[in-house]
Regions:
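N-terminal periplasmic "start-of-domain" segments of outer-membrane beta-barrel proteins
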Residues: 3-33, 61
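Structural signature of outer-membrane beta-barrel domains
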Residues: 12, 69, 81, 144-146, ...
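Transmembrane beta-barrel architecture of outer-membrane proteins
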Residues: 33, 37, 59, 119-121, ...
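Extracytoplasmic beta-strand/coil segments of soluble accessory domains associated
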Residues: 39-80, 102
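Non-catalytic regulatory/gating segments with a bias toward low-complexity or hydrophobic composition
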Residues: 42, 103-105, 124-126, 284
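Short acidic/polar hinge/loop motifs at secondary-structure boundaries
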Residues: 61, 80-108, 127-129
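Transmembrane beta-barrel wall of Gram-negative outer-membrane proteins
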Residues: 136, 143-174, 179-218, 267-277
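Acidic/polar loop-and-plug regions of large Gram-negative outer-membrane beta-barrel proteins
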Residues: 194, 202-271, 296-346
Length: 347
């Protein structure tokens, strides 16, 4: 008779499997995650280097053995999540994984793949929770610097007399971001439903996702050493590296930044477990991952304003549309478009 859902996978065992690997368990994630992003949990793992990159929410970068993410295979429950075209990875698509992780495992070294990512640098496998056999729940609320807020609610029915088991988790993160004008909002959800079918069969449906939106500091707005020193006068004693060249306010006082991203990429899996006899079982899994989203940034319509949306050029701050306090003059852009007889000059 089936008692619980058992998830099986090809997982290395520390000190036994003859490969260079490291594990991060659930307890370590709970103790150290805080308001960090999930890749940063691997910073203490040998051969792994993670950084917030541009500083905006979900824009983390992960390197393994010196190789970029396009040469590092990342999987969630054994399913590859790297981009099929260029091999990169957008961690903002998986912003809520920190609350759903059961364990993470890194395997350093060469791997082979016919599709997606040739894992020259190594492999990262993130395994999420399944249905919880214990009845109960919890709620947490955390705060951090730069207006960071994190709310999580989780509940599980445990195994009912009728053979059902429900586990659910909902969460939300929001804040202003460390970099100017990189405010973000992230909703997280996870569910797992299982049902016993007689003495020998059990099915389970699991799904999770993190619809998120966040503003970014444009990758083309990097400043030189002299450029960073130039913006020091705008920061009021704060770190110059928090400066965002395209951060500013519209005519109605609304906060703006030229780069914005929204995406939602949920993953669902349907598992069937058949206990054939005392020594044999058959596990079948079907998974689906879909996604939709968009990103936008400013664009000049004609050559006169082709580069005006960029806050910097050649490592130096641009002053085409710039207020005396260093903020980008979105109000001036709006006025320029309103006064034009031939349509908007900058969109």
């Amino acid at each position: 008779m089936l008692k619980n859902i058992t998830v099986t996978a090809s997982r290395g065992v520390a000190r036994k499997t003859p490969i260079a690997m490291s594990d991060v368990d659930r307890r370590e994630v709970e103790n150290k995650l805080g308001n960090n992003e999930l890749p940063e949990m691997l910073n203490q793992t040998p051969g792994v280097y993670a950084t917030k990159n541009s500083g905006a929410y979900g824009d983390s970068k992960l390197n393994m053995r010196g190789f970029q993410s396009s040469n590092v295979a990342v999987m969630v429950n054994g399913v590859p999540v790297n981009d099929m075209e260029h091999g990169g990875l957008y961690w903002s698509n998986w912003g809520g994984l920190g609350e759903m992780v059961r364990y993470m495992q890194t395997q350093r070294g060469l791997g082979a793949s016919k599709v997606s990512v040739p894992s020259v640098g190594g492999t990262v496998n993130i395994v999420t929770k399944t249905t919880d056999s214990k009845r109960g729940g919890y709620a947490t609320y955390g705060v951090g610097n730069d207006g960071f807020n994190h709310l999580t609610v989780s509940v599980s029915t445990g195994l009912t007399k009728s053979g059902w088991n429900f586990s659910m988790l909902f969460g939300k993160k929001w804040g202003d971001g460390y970099i100017q004008g990189t405010n973000f909002s992230d909703y997280d959800y996870f569910f797992a439903v299982s049902k016993r079918l007689g003495q020998h069969h059990q099915i389970a449906l699991t799904g999770f996702g993190s619809p998120q939106s966040h503003y970014q500091r444009n990758q083309y707005d990097g400043l030189s050493v002299e450029g960073w020193q130039d913006v020091k006068r705008f920061m009021g004693g704060k770190s110059v590296y928090r400066y965002n060249p395209t951060y500013g306010f519209g005519k109605n006082g609304e906060r703006k930044s030229s780069a914005f991203n929204f995406y939602h990429k949920p993953q669902f899996s349907l598992n069937h477990i058949w206990l054939i006899d005392d020594k044999s079982s058959l596990n079948t899994a079907l998974y689906m991952s879909i996604g939709h989203g968009y990103g936008n940034s400013g664009q000049g319509i004609n050559s006169a304003y082709a580069n005006s949306w960029y806050g910097a050029a050649n490592g130096k701050l641009r002053y085409d549309f710039r207020h005396a306090d260093g903020t980008f003059a979105y109000d001036q852009v709006q006025e320029l478009n309103e006064q034009s007889d031939a349509g908007s000059k900058m969109v």
